[in-house]
């Protein structure tokens, strides 16, 4: 992995009681040893693989102001990280669920892009076997389940300050929503809405095939084509490129997909991240509620599965063998 650490700082927040978080600050930066580089590379890998929300700094963001000064050489990285950790402690102290942890600030370069990654990591206990085959306790950083993480694309921020996507963050677990405190600490608000972009794409594709007067099978083939392209981009860690997608759909209509989307005003970005759950709707219908869960391929609608909107009734012709077997055993047993 072509990852180069520029500067990295680590501090700690310790929860002593319900009201107090103790601040433990390092007096020096971490040395980018092989172990440190491996840790950052793993954190980068794990973070990059997760679904993220996008944001941008507000004009009043204290973190953005001090980061800009640090980038201009008016403040060193250690001082910047120490002051920022203090502000994070003040934000966390407002919430009873605050657990503390290790606060990491890492300025690194990956594939010619500079990043600042900010994360709160937990220390977990486990067991290890030593050279004498004895079992001893050990501790490790829980990188795989880190959910208080944000990353600033410094290159994008400094070259395109009007961007709505230079800051990414994880939304966190239920009850520990990053928006409740981490976004306040960052002085940021949500920017590019990835789900909205993907929903807009799905609507544009449906309208595009309808205007082209395709039959049902042709429409589903186009949806499958779009899904295949988007899924390939997702698996490769790349964004959906409208121009590339439009080329994939050449021949569907006399008008290109990009021209159609622009003319109809779907407000799609030239490129945006793929959202797996939204894109799945191109090829499947799924829903749950009231003790019922249904999931089926879109091509079955109108063939083996029929929906009557007036009565909100779904009729299934030909049930799966394992389901049919369960139904037969239950009904024959009189239960």
UniProtKB/Swiss-Prot annotation:
Keyword Signal appears in the UniProt entry: no
Keywords: Cytoplasm
A GO molecular function held by the record: single-stranded RNA binding
Any one Pfam family match given in the protein's UniProt record, by short name: NA37
CC terms in the record's Gene Ontology section: bacterial nucleoid; cytoplasm
Compartments, record wording: Cytoplasm, Nucleoid
UniProt-listed InterPro entries: Nucleoid_associated_NdpA
Highest taxon, organism lineage: Bacteria
UniProt entry tagged with the keyword Cytoplasm: yes
UniProt-listed PANTHER family: NUCLEOID-ASSOCIATED PROTEIN YEJK (PTHR38772:SF1), PTHR38772
Family statement drawn from the similarity comment of this UniProt entry: Belongs to the YejK family.
Name of this chain's protein: Nucleoid-associated protein YejK
Protein species of origin: Shigella sonnei (strain Ss046)
Record lineage: Bacteria, Pseudomonadati, Pseudomonadota, Gammaproteobacteria, Enterobacterales
Annotated gene: yejK
């Amino acid at each position: 992995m072509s990852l180069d650490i520029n500067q990295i700082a680590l501090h700690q927040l310790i929860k002593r009681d319900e009201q107090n978080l103790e601040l433990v600050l390092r007096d020096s930066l971490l040395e980018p040893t092989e172990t440190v580089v491996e840790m950052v590379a793993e954190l980068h890998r794990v973070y990059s693989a997760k679904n993220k929300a996008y944001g941008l700094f507000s004009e009043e963001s204290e973190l953005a102001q001090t980061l800009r000064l640090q980038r201009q050489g008016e403040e060193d990285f250690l001082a910047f990280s120490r002051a920022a950790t203090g502000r994070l402690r003040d934000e966390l102290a407002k919430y009873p669920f605050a657990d503390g942890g290790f606060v990491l600030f890492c300025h690194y370069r990956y594939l010619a892009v500079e990043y600042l990654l900010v994360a709160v990591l937990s220390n977990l206990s486990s067991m290890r076997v030593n050279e004498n085959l004895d079992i001893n306790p050990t501790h490790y950083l829980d990188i795989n389940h880190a959910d208080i993480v944000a990353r600033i694309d410094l290159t994008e921020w400094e070259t395109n300050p009007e961007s709505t996507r230079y800051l990414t963050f994880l939304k966190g677990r239920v009850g520990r929503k990053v928006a409740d405190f981490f976004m306040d600490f960052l002085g940021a608000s949500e920017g590019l809405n990835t789900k909205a972009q993907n929903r807009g794409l799905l609507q544009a594709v449906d309208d595009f095939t309808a205007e082209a007067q395709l039959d049902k099978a042709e429409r589903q083939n186009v949806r499958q084509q779009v899904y295949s392209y988007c899924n390939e981009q997702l698996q490769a860690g790349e964004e959906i490129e409208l121009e590339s997608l439009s080329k994939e759909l050449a021949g569907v209509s006399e008008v290109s997909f990009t021209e159609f989307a622009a003319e109809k005003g779907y407000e799609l970005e030239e490129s945006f991240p793929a959202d797996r759950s939204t894109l799945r709707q191109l090829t499947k219908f799924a829903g749950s509620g009231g003790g019922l869960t249904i999931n089926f391929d879109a091509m079955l609608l109108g063939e083996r599965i029929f929906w009557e909107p007036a009565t909100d009734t779904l009729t299934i012709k030909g049930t799966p063998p394992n389901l049919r077997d369960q139904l037969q055993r239950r009904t024959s047993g009189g239960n």
